[in-house]
């Protein structure tokens, strides 16, 4: 799972901490204060200051989006007030220090007289990007341990067991990438060029299989970290880190997600090197082999991570009664998507789409853990009817919020319904935006088509491009593309779980469920 330095206070020049004032007349000695004069550390962080050794702060290279979940986090930047912050970085004068560069041609002062073709320069740039990315990754992984793990352990902010759960096998990943970086540097010529990288990659990439345990642990790690943030000591520590320069305005989870982001980027990096490698270069065959290796590893880890995520959420489902348990849930190995939606009363629901069953729940706190209490019966995907509702077609009701919203067009709703004999359900669900709604529609359609195909009831597309269910004769739009894993559905859509509201309504929901007979057919109003 990318992702996305040390002291909590820095020594600074007096000039950086005060407003510019006209020079006062006085002895020259007063005007020329030593440039290394230090200011007193902030009192609120004195307990943390000596725990973290200073390191060089370098910008994190931004990674492209990946095909698995990539949880994005936004941090609000505070405006500077009058004087610049004590830790504000001043641009170094070009005459004394060269600006750090991420480009091979700038780093090694490539001269046009070296007779390199444009394609070869691009190849060297791609190889250097691979090497530089390893260096950045190693630095950030070490930072995560020294700036977060070790201080929290020493200050007893978290227990060792909790930190082991959150950080997983992160320590074991550092030597792997140090080995690759060392090999890449060894084959680099004095002029900065690299002739062959294929054999190195073919020999090194198989060790990335060890990412299996780290990535599979991320769902549980993220959940525990979010839970621990309710502890004011943890929240205070993480907030101070976020406001410190070493963090680059990234929170702890951004750093913990960097290994996964790096893993899924390797195929792109290797393809870029291959694209600029001449056909007669011996490296081409090795690069093609390396791409096949990393694609297989990523696919395998992706599968195992998905299974781990599915198990995690199945273990946190709470059933109000035995009749809600469904063998389709127990047999599911893949969680197609999940996230927060609202019903037509504005009540927050957390919906899970497993391989063959849709489960609508309410988030509750149980034994100090976030769990998901089933609301109504699970809906088999094969019997599920999906309807895309036009904006304004659904009216909010049953609350003050709904009373004042009647004049507005209610947007981003879709409806799922189910009828099997005397059992029936209808739920109008609202996504937070159009994109999120379309993701849900695509994912449900894809899951339904997969189930029907597996049952030998493959639907057909009519002339209008709709999916025709041969069993019911109902017509649905065909999903355009297979949905990416929606592990970021809550974070990217800025939806947070309102556990306080859920806890208050828990008893009311139980009474509602007990009073609802199986033959009752109506909207999912809580």
From Swiss-Prot:
Superkingdom, taxonomy of origin: Eukaryota
Gene3D superfamilies cross-referenced by the UniProt entry: Dbl homology (DH) domain, Pleckstrin-homology domain (PH domain)/Phosphotyrosine-binding domain (PTB)
Stored Pfam families: RhoGEF, SOS1_NGEF_PH
Bias (Polar residues) ranges: 466-475
Protein name: Rho guanine nucleotide exchange factor 3
Organism, scientific name: Homo sapiens (Human)
Residue(s) carrying Phosphoserine: 47, 70
Quaternary assembly: Interacts with RHOA and RHOB.
BP GO annotations: positive regulation of Rho protein signal transduction; regulation of small GTPase mediated signal transduction; Rho protein signal transduction
Lineage: Eukaryota, Metazoa, Chordata, Craniata, Vertebrata
Tissue specificity comment: Widely expressed. Highest levels are found in adult brain and skeletal muscle. Lower levels are found in heart and kidney.
GO molecular function ontology, one term from the record: guanyl-nucleotide exchange factor activity
Purpose: Acts as a guanine nucleotide exchange factor (GEF) for RhoA and RhoB GTPases.
Keywords: Cytoplasm, Guanine-nucleotide releasing factor, Phosphoprotein
């Amino acid at each position: 799972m990318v992702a996305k330095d040390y002291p909590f206070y820095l020594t600074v020049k007096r000039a950086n901490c005060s407003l510019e004032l006209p020079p006062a007349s006085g002895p020259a000695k007063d005007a020329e204060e030593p440039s290394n004069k230090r200011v007193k550390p902030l009192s609120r962080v004195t307990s943390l200051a000596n725990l973290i050794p200073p390191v060089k702060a370098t910008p994190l290279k931004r990674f492209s989006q990946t095909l698995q979940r990539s949880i994005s986090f936004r941090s609000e930047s505070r405006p500077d007030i009058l004087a610049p912050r004590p830790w504000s970085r001043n641009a170094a004068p070009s005459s004394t220090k060269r600006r750090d560069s991420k480009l091979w041609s700038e780093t090694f002062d490539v001269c046009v007289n070296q007779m390199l073709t444009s394609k070869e320069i691009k190849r060297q740039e791609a190889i250097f990007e691979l090497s530089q990315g390893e260096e950045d990754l190693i630095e950030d992984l070490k930072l995560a341990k020294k700036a977060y793990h070790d201080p929290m352990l020493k200050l007893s902010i978290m227990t060792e067991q909790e930190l082991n759960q959150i950080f997983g096998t992160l320590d074991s990943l550092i030597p792997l990438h140090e080995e690759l970086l060392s090999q890449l540097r060894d084959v680099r010529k004095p002029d900065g060029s690299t002739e062959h990288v294929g054999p190195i990659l073919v020999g090194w990439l198989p060790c990335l299989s060890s990412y299996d345990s780290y990535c599979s642990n991320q769902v549980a790690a993220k959940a525990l970290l979010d839970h621990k943030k309710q502890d004011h000591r943890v929240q205070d520590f993480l907030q101070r880190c976020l406001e410190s320069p070493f963090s680059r305005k990234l929170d702890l989870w951004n750093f913990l997600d960097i290994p996964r982001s790096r893993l899924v980027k390797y195929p792109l990096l290797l393809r870029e090197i291959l694209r600029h490698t001449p056909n007669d270069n011996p490296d081409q065959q090795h690069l093609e082999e390396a791409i096949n290796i990393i694609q297989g590893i990523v696919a395998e880890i992706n599968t195992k991570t998905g299974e781990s995520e599915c198990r995690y959420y199945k273990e946190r489902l709470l059933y109000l009664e035995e009749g809600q348990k469904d063998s389709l849930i127990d047999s599911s190995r893949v969680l197609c998507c999940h996230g927060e939606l609202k019903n037509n009363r504005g009540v927050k629901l957390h919906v899970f789409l497993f391989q063959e069953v849709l489960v609508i729940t309410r988030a509750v706190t149980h034994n100090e853990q976030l769990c998901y209490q089933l609301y109504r019966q699970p809906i088999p995907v094969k019997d599920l009817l999906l309807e895309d509702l036009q904006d304004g077609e659904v009216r909010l009701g049953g609350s003050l919020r709904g009373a004042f919203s009647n004049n507005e067009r209610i947007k981003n709703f879709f409806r799922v319904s189910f009828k099997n004999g005397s059992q029936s359900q209808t739920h109008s669900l609202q996504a937070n935006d159009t994109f999120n709604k379309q993701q849900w529609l695509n994912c449900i359609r894809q899951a339904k088509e997969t189930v029907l195909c597996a049952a030998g009831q493959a639907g057909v597309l009519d002339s209008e491009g709709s999916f025709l269910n041969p069993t019911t004769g109902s017509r649905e739009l065909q999903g355009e593309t297979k949905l990416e894993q929606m592990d970021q559905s809550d974070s990217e859509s800025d939806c947070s779980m309102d556990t306080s509201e859920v806890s208050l309504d828990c008893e009311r929901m139980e009474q509602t469920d007990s009073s609802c007979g199986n033959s009752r057919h109506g909207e999912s109003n809580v």
